[in-house]
């Protein structure tokens, strides 16, 4: 909106620069989240929209009165900042907003069910998976129709591994959407544990998106160019800004939780950025914390079903360390450090290829 008005009609040259609009979007989303979140917290407390706490984690019972669904606020702030600062004629921007809203809506349905039924189960697994499946399918098909190439790239290699057939690419992209959204959802179990690794991952991906959309940088760095994708940089930075605003209230002890409304939206948008910038494989490194959390659950369930033995004291793995006596803050900060280092290594692949 501001982009079209100030650059399109008044020819204010500052707004032609992607970096300026991305920075402006960051601060708009940050301050809007800071402003709206206290009001949301008061409303949520009045409505008793609190996160039901699992009986298997007795140390978290003091959090039972903490409101949830804070993800609605930072998703809303991101959309406002994107509408103001990004070009809405860009399909990658529009699809990015659709991903945020769509995955957040599925999360909202799950959060609402948990609050309404006052248990931690939420929607049935079949319904939740079905909604995520359809949403992932729609976005993946739209990306294919948009003409996004289907080459599969590996980190630190300048040439693609191979070109996927269209049907295989759509199926693969759907897998990335489904696995990443659920991985971030599983990670969201301690104060700030999902938000900071999401910030690191989004910052890394936003750099890759910017390079992919810039002809000079992509040529110099031997990085695959994706026409028009650079505009998504504005939306990504807006989401990072809103996450910093959310973290202001979500740091330990949290005043609000993001809920599935936030975690599914984050996972979906991270997956979307990875797909359009051809970083599906590198996402395993950038989202290392999400991968480890998910693997811990898979291994725990698999071990118990096949051997009737548990590999961990509790899964996801952040609860395992809590059960071993680690303070919550120690678990959180150490996981942050791992995430930061993983993303620094991932960024090296821009130059080392």
Curated annotation (Swiss-Prot):
GO terms for molecular function: metal ion binding; phospho-N-acetylmuramoyl-pentapeptide-transferase activity; UDP-N-acetylmuramoyl-L-alanyl-D-glutamyl-meso-2,6-diaminopimelyl-D-alanyl-D-alanine:undecaprenyl-phosphate transferase activity. The keyword Cell wall biogenesis/degradation applies. This is Phospho-N-acetylmuramoyl-pentapeptide-transferase. Pathway: Cell wall biogenesis; peptidoglycan biosynthesis. It is a multi-pass membrane protein. Its EC number is 2.7.8.13. Its cofactor is Mg(2+). Belongs to the glycosyltransferase 4 family. MraY subfamily. Catalyzes the initial step of the lipid cycle reactions in the biosynthesis of the cell wall peptidoglycan: transfers peptidoglycan precursor phospho-MurNAc-pentapeptide from UDP-MurNAc-pentapeptide onto the lipid carrier undecaprenyl phosphate, yielding undecaprenyl-pyrophosphoryl-MurNAc-pentapeptide, known as lipid I. One of its GO terms (cellular component) is plasma membrane. The lineage of its organism: Bacteria, Pseudomonadati, Campylobacterota, Epsilonproteobacteria, Campylobacterales. It comes from the Bacteria. It is found in: Cell inner membrane. The chain crosses the membrane at residues 24-44, 66-86, 88-108, 129-149, 160-180, 192-212, 229-249, 256-276, 281-301, 330-350. It catalyses: UDP-N-acetyl-alpha-D-muramoyl-L-alanyl-gamma-D-glutamyl-meso-2,6-diaminopimeloyl-D-alanyl-D-alanine + di-trans,octa-cis-undecaprenyl phosphate = di-trans,octa-cis-undecaprenyl diphospho-N-acetyl-alpha-D-muramoyl-L-alanyl-D-glutamyl-meso-2,6-diaminopimeloyl-D-alanyl-D-alanine + UMP. It is an enzyme of class 2 (transferase). Pfam families: Glycos_transf_4 (PF00953), MraY_sig1 (PF10555). One of its GO terms (biological process) is cell wall organization.
